[in-house]
Each structure stands twice: as structure tokens, then as C-alpha cells.
């Protein structure tokens, strides 16, 4: 370090060693941080980190790709900064931990943007070229934002799911799971968004409250004799009546094909003013009240006795097109929590209905499926053709009422499925899609996908641990994965499908590889322009190109294949050590990645999963435009500094919600200043210290210096343990305590007298500086993962010849003999010092003393405390920061106390101690004896402090 003193000030008559440093007190972060970002890029710091780490064990944090659309928000900042802390801490722990950022580029949001800008009639080729350009522009914009946050990575060479090599490798991954037998085509109800015009993944569905009409509808008796027999009656008492269902989806009534009862629930035949009604016995009283009817139970029967009975469609009298009957099927999923205990079944629009009807012998061609992809009924549907299902709801209620089938109608607010992009309601809709079968046995005869994935969950470490059960439950209960989408901007499911049978071409695997080669050269556009005859010759007359695209969750879910082992295999490796994302990714990227790796490799693609919560305001409310409580990371970085965002994230327990507000940021800023002031003190007091020239051997250090280094080494061991377990908030909490209490409140406070008043080149002062040198090395490195700009700024002052702190590893402190005993002893001394400080404060309040140096204390101590205090000899006064200190032995702890008296001596002009020998030298009447010695003779001798 430089040897410059603060020579801009006039020299004092009796100078002290007050040094300066180019590391300023004010961080001026908004101004300085962008300069560091620029410098890191220009000087190739990330590449230098990689070079320094070459040959070490690899640690791979695989970046879950954000979507290439829109500005980065606070959630992005949380995610990227947490990743940056992990990567930097692993590099400094001695690993080669590259960070390759990535982006998710295909899919609906970008396609929507292109439609907004250019309309919906663009040719497919133009949609793709404009989508590529748009995604590229968004990536560059987001990249600037991430770099501004101090995140180091391979920004020049990120992975993008739209890069040709990644698109091609994704097709090869598809080929792998087809080869293993997991993929099939079938008709099933899937999540369907009318605005997307496509199936949705489970992760693309969110729930919001919605108000819909709820109706109780009667299906009239079609087989009165059989119904009477089922209830043990010779005949029904009257002909009018039927079975009653309750539904919140009137629009499904036109597609009704069955009724479901629970086999063990008891059903009652109730005589009412509206005829005989069949209702679950335990729901009779509630239903009579709701229907405003009086009723008498005529007979009862368990559901199993009613199986196979048929009832007329409730609109049979309204239009001949509904003159059909619905059979009673049995289903364990029927409950009596609400409604009538009878479920109407439209198998095209409900998973349980679909499964039940399939189990009872219905085939795909039997299903009534009148709702088109845009949410309108087909024109040929009686009474409601061409209507949107939402517009049809009230008209269906009217028609049911006119037909005499409606018993009750009212509004009902419930949690309902919505598209996460459009925020509009979605439905289950039976469509022909490509699926990955969760319970399919692969061709090699191994375990099912579900079994393999659950084993993968068991083998994964979770941070926090509750994530394991959450993901396990999701995998255990999920339906088959709908792989296909009906869009343009996505990786094609590049199949040739037989026009009549719907079967895949027998050479599908070979053909997929041929398509992949073309995609590798010119992107997914190659499939759009491909003439089938190029690949299948005369078979082109029999087969058509499949127009479906892959679910974008397959894009990101196969990055373990097309990134870790594909585009970036030279830097990365499989499996990754860690995936780190928000808690929503248990049903998103964590989930899809697990399924694809289970199919391809029979294992999870990660060794560990780290989950963080979402940001909320200071009152725990989610951030929203309507509440006006959102916080923009750009604005905070430009006003307070990205370092404040980084410190906030690191100091917050990310396993729950991350609360942020102006008040919280204010507290974080105050904490930052304390750390910065500590660094400034360290750097200033090392500014005339050259380790090679001035370092003192460990065994010659003063005792308190040995203690400080031993204590810091012990703390570092704790901190590295936290870093290894990704526990960052304890790291910050302990470092803030270390800076404010262990250093600022104790060690540095004690040290000031020695640093400032001892002879500049004395052993006592150089001992202190040697200890500070080691402490600074250690402190900057454990701060660096989260206080990235500040640690680098301080490092360049501390070690100007070094390129960057980020090529360093955690500090190897010198070994201090007897460190455990030393730490234990000084813990006692600090405890006593606390009692002395309290006594001094009481004396100051009583106006008996001014500063602590005006005091002389007598410490009454027993046992180990007495031994520790007396071992310091005359240096005890320096530890207590008093002008004199004596120790009085007492028998036990009950007798321990502190006596404080004002010194009767003069104050030394230079060191401010009150001493008997002030003025002992006539030429220097305001100096004490030790200051005279330190300035003009050999200097005082200290051993402990």
C-alpha cells in the first residue's frame, strides 16, 4: 500500500499517526458502480476468473432462463443476485464455478407482441424472423440490467433457446423420449386458453376469483320402472321428476353425456312440489331450503343400486338435438360437500368425467365436443351455435328454465383457472394432443416416468427442505404432460403423421435427426419450408407434416441436454450442482427439467434445488400496479446503488417472502455505511504498511492482535459453512455484528491509541497493522460475494497490483497458537469490559467524569476473570480505555463490581490520557511520559494491548 499520509492538513506540534486512504467515506454508488461494470467488461474480469479457476473441481449453477420479454423487475433482481452470490462464493471456495446466463425465447408472449405490432395475418416465416429480432432486442435490454446489478457471467456467450444449435438439440431430445416410448397421441381434456388458441402447461395456469352462474338442474326419468326397482318400490308414486345435479359451468350442459354417483353414498327419492327428486340423503334438507320446496323422503338406496339408470337430457323438450339420455356411472370422486351429491358429466370438458366415461366404454368418437378453440360453440349446436360459451351461460339458464328443468340459479364466486399470460378464464377441453405418459412403462421395461421422477426428487437436496415434499406431491399427482402446442413461434414437433391412421412415420427417429441437421444450419424455419418429398419421397402422398410446436417448458426443461451437454458443454457439465429459482418453479422449470431428464437419463438433472420466495412490501402485500407499491430495481440502483439491493437480498431470509420498502432500504443503507466505515478505517490504518517490509511474526504479536486474528479465523469458518449451505442472511448478520461490535465496538476501538500514538515503526504499531492486514484480507473476501462493487473498490486500494478480488479464494489466516483458549479468555475480558463501560456511563451521567479517559477504575473480580484481567498488567487500561486500571481480588462473583473515580492528573495534549507524568519533561509541558518516549526515545513497551 502507499506510504502517503494526510499531508494536506497543517502538521500538529505533536503529530499522531492519523492516515488517509483513497477509499472514500461516501460510497457514491450510483456513480461508481457503472464504472466498475464497464471496467470489468473491458478488462475481461470474468475470463480472468475462469483462467484462475481452471483445473479446480467444477461447480455448476445452471441458470433457469428468464423470458426474453420486458424490463427486468425486482423478482429478476432477487433471482440473479442470489445466483451471483452462490457462484462467487463457490469460486472463492476453490471451485471452478462458471456462470452461463440464458434466455427462454420461444412461445406465446413474444408471438402476442408480434401480433400487436404487425397484425395476425403475417406469414409464418415473417412471424419467426420478427420474433427472433424481438427476442434479441429484449435480451440485450435485460442483459444491461443484469450487469448493472453486479452480476458476473459469460454475458458475451449466453445460451438462448432460439439459437439454432439449441433448437436442433431439443429435437434430438424429443427423439430420445420417443425412442424410449414415453410419447403418445391421444384425445384428452387439457388446459385450453381461447386467447392463446392453444393448450397450456400446468405451470401456465393461475387461479383467480371469478363469479359464475351456479345452477341446479333436473334430468327427467327415462326409465321409471327400473328407477322404482332400484329404490325397492313396486312403482314410482308419480311420473314427474328426475335426478338433480349442481354445476358452476352451465356451458357444459349441452355436451352432457353421463351422470356420476358415488357407489357408497345413500341417495333419497324425495317427493316435492316439483315431482320426485333424487338427491344425496345428507343434502336433502339443504337442497329443499335452496330450492324453496318442501319434501318427503319416499325411499333411499346406495349409489351402487342406481348404476346404469338413464335420465333425459334437461334440454330434450327444448330441441330435438338434445333428445338423448344420460346413463348413471359410479365414481369415487363424487362428494356431498356441496350441491346434490350428483355430478353431471361432460367428458370433453373435465378430466374426471373423461376418465370415468372412458372407463365405462366410451371411445374418442363418442365424445360430444362442441366448443371450438376460440371459445365459441360450433354453428351446428342446437340453440346456442356460434355463441361464446361465456355469452351462452345466461341463455342456457333461460332455456333450462323454459324447459322446466331448472330448480335454482344464482351467482357464485369461486377460485377459477386463468391463463397466466392473458389473465382470462380457461377451460378443460378435449383435443388431440401429444403427451408424455407419466405411467407409461418405457420400451426398455424399466420404471414408469412417475416412478423415476419421484426417485429423482428423493435423491435431490432441497434448500429449504420443505421443497422436497412439495415437488414430490406435484409429481405424484400430476396428469400426463401435454407436450404439444398450436402456435408458430416454437420448436416444431417435426413428425410426419399418416393422413388416415394418425400413426407416426416408421422412420420417425431417423427423420427427426435429418430435420435437426437442417435446423442446426438455419433454425426452426427449416421445418416450415421443408418439402416432405425431400425426406420421405413418395410417402409424402400418405403423410402430412405435424404443425404442432413443443411446449416452451420442454424448451427450458431440456436445457440440461441442449445447454449443459450441448451448446455450452465445454464450460458446463451434467448433472448440475444447483438449480435456483422462485418457488413457482416447483411446477415450472424444476418440474419440466426433472421429467425430461428422467425420460432421457433416468435421473434428476440437478443435485440440489434452491427455492426463493417472492417480493412483498413492508406490510407483506404482493407488489402490484393497483396498490402502487412496486419497487423498480433500476430506480433503486440509480438512487441508492445496486449494492444496496444486493445487501438487502443477502440479508433477507429468501426461503420466505422478501419484504422491501423505503424504510427497509433505509435500514439496509445504514448497515452498508457501517461496513464501509469499517473498511475505510482498516484501509487508512494500513496505508503506510508494506507487508513484506513491516510484517511482524505471529509469535511476536501483542496478545489482543493474536486474539483478533484467531477470532476472525473462527468467524470465517462459520461463514464459509453458511455459504456452503446457501445461508446468506446469517453471513450478513454475523458480518454486520463483526464490523460494528467485534471490530468497531471493541478491537478497533482499543487499537486506536496504539495505532495513533505509538511510534510509527514500533513493534507495537506494526503488530497491530499486521493483524489488520490479515483481517482486511479475510473480511474483503467474505464480503465479496454480496458486496461486489464495494469489495472490489476496497481491494484495488488494498492490493492495487491485483486484477480483481474475484480471482482470489477465501483467506488462509496464519495459525495462532492456543487460539481456542485465547478466544475463551478474551470473551471473559470483553464481558468485564462491558460492565466497566456501563459503570463509566453511569459516572458520566452523574457528571463525575467526561470521557472514559478521564476515569480511573478499580475492577473487583474473582476466579478466571481476575486471572484474565491481571494477566494484562498495565495494558488493562488500554483495553478498558481508561487512564488507569487496577484489579482487586474478591472471593466470588457476588462481590464483583467496578469502582470509577475521576483522575486527579493532567490530560496529555497528544494521547488525551490523564497521567501523573504529564509535564515531566520541561521542554514539553503538555506531553505525558509515554508520548515523549514514543516521539523522542525508544517508545513504550506493550505486551497485551
From Swiss-Prot:
UniProt binding sites for ATP: 625
Enzyme Commission code: 6.1.1.5
Cofactor binding mode and count: Binds 1 zinc ion per subunit.
Family annotation (InterPro entries): aa-tRNA-synth_I_CS, aa-tRNA-synth_Ia, Anticodon_Ile_BEm, Ile-tRNA-ligase, Ile-tRNA-ligase_type1, Ile-tRNA_ligase, M/V/L/I-tRNA-synth_anticd-bd, Rossmann-like_a/b/a_fold
Transmembrane segments: none
CC per GO annotation: cytosol
Cell location: Cytoplasm
Signal peptide per UniProt: none
Binding site for L-isoleucyl-5'-AMP: 581
GO molecular function term, any single one: zinc ion binding
Binding annotation for Zn(2+): 908, 911, 928, 931
Protein family (similarity comment): Belongs to the class-I aminoacyl-tRNA synthetase family. IleS type 1 subfamily.
Assembly behavior: Monomer.
Protein name (Swiss-Prot/TrEMBL): Isoleucine--tRNA ligase
Organism expressing this protein natively: Burkholderia lata (strain ATCC 17760 / DSM 23089 / LMG 22485 / NCIMB 9086 / R18194 / 383)
Lineage: Bacteria, Pseudomonadati, Pseudomonadota, Betaproteobacteria, Burkholderiales
GN (gene name): ileS
Amino acid at each position: 500500500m502507499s506510504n502517503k499520509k494526510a499531508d494536506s492538513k497543517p502538521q500538529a506540534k505533536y503529530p499522531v499517526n492519523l492516515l488517509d486512504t483513497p477509499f472514500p467515506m461516501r460510497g457514491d454508488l450510483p456513480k461508481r458502480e457503472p464504472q466498475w461494470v464497464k471496467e470489468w467488461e473491458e478488462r475481461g474480469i470474468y475470463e480472468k476468473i475462469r483462467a484462475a479457476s481452471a483445473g479446480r473441481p467444477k461447480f455448476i449453477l445452471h441458470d433457469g432462463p428468464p423470458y426474453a420479454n420486458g424490463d427486468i423487475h425486482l423478482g429478476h433482481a432477487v433471482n440473479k443476485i442470489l445466483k451471483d452470490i452462490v457462484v462467487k462464493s463457490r469460486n472463492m471456495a476453490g471451485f471452478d464455478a462458471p456462470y452461463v446466463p440464458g434466455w427462454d425465447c420461444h412461445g406465446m408472449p413474444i408471438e402476442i407482441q408480434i401480433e400487436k405490432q404487425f397484425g395476425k395475418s403475417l406469414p409464418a416465416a415473417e412471424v419467426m424472423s420478427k420474433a427472433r429480432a424481438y427476442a434479441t432486442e429484449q435480451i440485450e435490454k435485460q442483459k444491461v440490467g443484469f450487469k448493472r446489478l453486479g452480476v458476473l457471467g459469460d454475458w458475451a456467450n449466453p445460451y438462448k433457446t432460439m439459437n439454432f444449435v439449441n433448437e436442433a438439440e431439443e429435437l434430438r431430445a424429443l427423439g430420445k423420449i420417443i425412442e424410449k416410448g414415453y410419447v403418445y397421441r391421444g384425445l384428452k381434456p387439457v388446459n385450453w386458453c381461447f386467447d392463446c388458441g392453444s393448450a397450456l402447461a400446468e405451470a401456465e395456469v393461475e387461479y383467480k376469483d371469478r363469479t359464475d352462474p351456479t345452477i341446479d338442474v333436473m334430468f327427467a326419468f327415462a326409465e321409471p320402472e327400473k328407477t322404482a326397482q332400484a329404490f325397492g318400490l313396486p312403482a314410482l308414486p308419480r311420473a314427474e321428476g328426475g335426478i338433480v345435479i349442481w354445476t358452476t359451468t352451465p356451458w357444459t350442459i349441452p355436451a352432457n353425456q353421463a351422470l356420476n354417483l358415488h357407489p357408497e353414498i345413500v341417495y333419497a327419492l324425495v317427493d316435492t312440489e316439483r315431482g320426485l327428486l333424487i338427491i344425496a340423503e345428507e343434502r336433502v334438507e339443504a337442497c329443499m331450503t335452496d330450492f324453496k320446496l318442501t319434501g318427503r323422503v319416499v325411499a333411499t338406496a346406495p349409489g351402487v343400486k342406481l348404476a346404469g339408470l338413464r335420465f333425459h337430457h334437461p334440454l330434450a323438450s327444448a330441441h330435438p338435438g338434445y333428445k338423448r339420455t344420460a346413463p348413471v356411472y359410479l365414481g369415487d370422486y363424487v362428494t356431498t360437500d356441496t350441491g346434490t351429491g350428483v355430478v353431471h358429466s361432460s367428458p370433453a370438458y373435465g378430466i374426471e368425467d373423461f376418465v370415468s366415461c372412458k372407463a365405462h366404454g366410451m371411445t374418442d368418437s363418442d365424445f360430444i365436443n362442441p366448443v371450438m378453440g376460440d371459445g365459441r360453440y360450433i354453428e351446428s349446436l342446437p340453440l346456442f351455435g356460434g355463441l361464446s360459451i361465456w355469452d351462452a351461460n345466461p341463455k342456457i339458464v333461460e332455456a333450462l328454465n323454459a324447459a322446466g328443468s331448472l330448480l335454482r340459479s344464482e351467482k357464485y364466486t369461486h377460485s377459477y383457472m386463468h391463463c397466466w399470460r392473458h389473465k382470462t378464464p380457461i377451460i378443460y377441453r378435449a383435443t388431440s394432443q401429444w403427451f408424455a405418459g407419466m405411467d407409461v412403462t418405457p420400451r426398455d421395461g424399466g420404471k414408469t416416468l412417475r416412478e423415476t421422477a419421484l426417485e429423482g426428487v428423493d435423491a435431490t437436496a432441497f434448500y429449504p427442505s420443505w421443497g422436497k415434499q412439495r415437488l414430490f406431491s406435484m409429481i405424484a399427482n400430476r396428469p400426463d404432460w401435454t407436450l404439444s402446442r398450436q402456435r408458430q413461434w416454437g420448436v416444431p414437433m417435426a413428425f410426419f403423421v399418416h393422413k388416415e391412421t394418425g400413426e407416426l412415420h416408421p422412420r420417425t427417429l431417423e427423420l427427426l435427426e435429418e430435420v435437426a441437421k437442417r435446423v442446426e444450419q438455419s433454425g426452426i424455419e427449416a421445418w416450415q419450408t421443408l418439402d416432405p418429398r425431400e425426406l420421405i419421397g413418395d410417402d409424402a402422398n400418405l403423410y402430412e407434416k405435424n404443425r404442432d410446436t413443443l411446449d416452451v417448458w420442454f424448451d427450458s426443461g431440456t436445457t440440461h441436454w441442449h445447454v449443459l451437454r450441448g451448446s455450452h458443454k465445454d464450460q458446463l457439465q451434467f448433472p448440475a450442482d444447483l438449480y435456483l429459482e422462485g418457488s413457482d418453479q416447483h411446477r415450472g422449470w424444476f418440474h419440466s427439467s426433472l421429467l425430461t431428464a428422467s425420460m432421457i437419463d433416468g435421473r434428476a438433472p440437478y443435485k440440489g434445488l434452491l427455492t426463493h420466495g417472492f417480493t412483498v412490501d413492508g406490510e407483506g402485500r404482493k407488489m402490484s400496479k393497483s396498490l402502487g407499491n412496486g419497487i423498480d430495481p433500476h430506480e433503486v440502483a440509480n438512487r441508492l446503488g445496486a449494492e444496496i439491493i444486493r445487501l438487502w437480498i443477502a440479508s433477507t431470509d429468501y426461503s420466505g417472502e422478501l419484504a422491501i420498502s423505503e424504510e427497509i432500504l433505509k435500514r439496509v443503507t445504514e448497515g452498508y455505511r457501517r461496513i464501509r466505515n469499517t473498511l475505510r478505517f482498516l484501509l487508512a490504518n494500513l496505508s503506510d504498511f508494506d507487508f513484506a517490509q513491516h510484517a511482524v511474526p505471529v509469535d511476536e504479536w501483542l496478545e489482543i492482535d493474536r486474539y483478533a486474528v484467531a477470532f476472525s479465523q473462527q468467524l470465517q469458518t462459520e461463514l464459509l459453512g453458511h455459504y456452503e449451505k446457501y445461508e446468506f442472511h446469517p453471513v450478513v448478520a454475523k458480518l454486520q455484528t463483526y464490523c460494528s461490535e467485534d471490530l468497531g465496538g471493541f478491537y478497533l476501538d482499543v487499537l486506536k491509541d496504539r495505532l495513533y500514538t505509538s511510534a510509527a515503526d514500533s513493534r507495537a504499531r506494526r503488530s497491530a497493522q499486521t493483524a489488520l492486514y490479515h483481517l482486511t484480507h479475510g473480511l474483503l473476501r467474505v464480503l465479496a460475494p454480496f458486496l461486489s462493487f464495494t469489495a472490489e473498490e476496497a481491494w484495488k486500494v488494498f492490493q492495487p497490483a491485483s486484477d480483481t478480488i474475484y480471482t482470489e479464494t477465501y483467506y488462509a489466516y496464519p495459525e495462532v497458537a492456543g487460539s481456542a483458549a485465547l478466544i475463551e479468555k478474551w470473551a471473559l475480558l470483553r464481558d468485564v469490559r462491558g460492565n466497566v463501560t456501563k459503570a463509566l456511563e453511569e459516572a458520566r451521567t452523574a457528571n463525575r467524569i467526561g470521557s472514559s479517559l478521564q476515569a480511573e477504575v478499580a475492577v473487583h473480580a474473582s476466579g478466571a476473570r481476575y486471572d484474565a484481567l491481571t494477566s494484562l498488567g498495565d495494558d488493562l487500561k488500554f483495553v478498558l480505555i481508561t487512564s488507569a486500571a487496577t484489579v482487586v481480588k474478591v472471593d466470588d462473583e457476588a462481590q464483583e463490581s467496578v469502582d470509577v473515580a475521576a483522575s486527579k492528573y493532567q490530560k496529555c495534549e497528544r494521547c488525551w490520557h490523564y497521567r501523573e507524568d504529564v509535564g515531566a519533561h520541561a521542554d514539553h509541558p503538555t506531553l505525558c511520559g509515554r508520548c515523549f518516549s514514543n516521539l523522542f526515545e525508544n517508545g513504550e513497551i506493550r505486551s497485551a494491548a
